[in-house]
Amino acid sequence: MVAYAEYIKRLHADADAIYEIAEEARSKGHDPRMSVEIPKANDLADRTQKLLDFLHPRQTADQIRELTKEYDGNRERVAIEIAKIVCAESYLYGEIVDCADCGGSGEIKKGNWVSECYSCGGSGNSMGFKDEIGISAWRDTLSLFAEKKKSPLWKLGDDTQFLSELAIYHGVCAGLAVLTEGILVAPLEGVVSSRFLTNEDGSPSLAISFAGPIRSAGGTGQALSVLIADIL
């Protein structure tokens, strides 16, 4: 038993050392992202939270564990509820700021050429978060969001539109991460964005953009991500 414990301890230590090397390599800016995308974690809840760190650290792991007990392990129900929570958190506690990677320009210079910023999609905007996102109880957050929804949440062409689009995008990514158990790339690379479009009759509609890696989620994950977007 002692030998096994030492073996596990050595595995963790070696993994930490490898991650340090990888982070140093990524920091040089020769890759699309400046940090290692694959996080280390212990269980589904922890994996999902680490996977969603790009949405800003929050209490997702504890929420998943609580909801898993509440819904008797029904992962689809948990995914939908987590999507609602993350969407509400991003809308209520989020604020529009300049993208940290490009400084708000929407472009990244690499040597003699310029490319669209990967992090913000060329918009120059990103989302910052207030401290409440890490301390507010999720039930209180959902109640507050329900009150907010009694009046229009966004206006076309306004900052509230970008905030709402980003909040829905965050919710879809979070729900998909739970569905795929936090082990697939689909929530990171498969969901590109969410946007409000205008129909011919002037009514708004929601468009979710996907990329090739969404295929790793399988048909159920892909279909449920659209359902989650509709619910949000």
Please annotate each region the language model reported.
Residues 108-111, 126-127:
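Short, non-ligating residues that shape and space the ligands of small metal-coordination modules
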Residues 18, 99-104:
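Non-transmembrane amphipathic alpha-helical segments
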Residues 96, 111-114:
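Processing junctions and N-termini across compartments
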Residues 1-96, 120, 127-232:
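Extended, Lys/Arg-rich, non-catalytic nucleic-acid recognition/anchoring regions
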